[in-house]
Amino acid sequence: MSFNNIVTPEWLSAHLSDPTIKILDCTTYMLAQPVGPSKIESGRGQYLKGHIPGAQHVCMEKDFSEPGARFAFTVPSPDTFNRLMQRLGINHDDHVVLYGHQQMSVVTRIWFVLHAMGQRKISILNGGLALWVKSGFELSDQLPAVKTSHYKAVRRVERLADITRASEAITDPQKVLLNALKKEQFLGTGGAHYGRSGRIPNSVSWPATDLYDSQSGEFKSQDELTVLLKQLDLQPSQQVLNY
């Protein structure tokens, strides 16, 4: 079965009975603080009230970050990731569909971790839980039965940049540091920060919130995104490092 990176509620509804489709409710609330890391609140309570049938809940902080790491949201080690995927009953050949409630950045972050750790088939539900409900599809309050899998991560080290690679990119014209924070955070004029406002030198600003409609949670069309991308004046030969 082929797959798209973005799927519709109609598509997901038609594939709910497919045992190779594994649905993850990624709802996690990031509450920005004036200084320092955001306060994280689990969305499990929202999940228990009602979720897409068959979905399991995951938390970006507790499940998709390395416990005890020096910095928040550090990509998990292969061993940590293996245990998570085994607990969730996910296999390499499964098609993982992600959705959330309100904050799209949490969902895309989990998409990236799955991708970096070697999962091939990963999609995001366009519009999230809100569009699912608006489209007239049912919710469930039942916890799905899960059979433990035998997962072994294949980490794509080329998808991850450490401090050395990021530092080298500052002066390398073949690399672009792309800042996904809000414009005022990029400029250092407002918003939350980690003790020092501003950005990595020579970064380019493309706020993640420009990628989707803030009201509906749906991604902008390919034509709309192409217009935005052209404004950044990136070259196909350049390597992009996101942060």
Name each model-derived stretch.
Residues 1-243:
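Cytosolic catalytic domains that perform sulfur/thiol-centered chemistry
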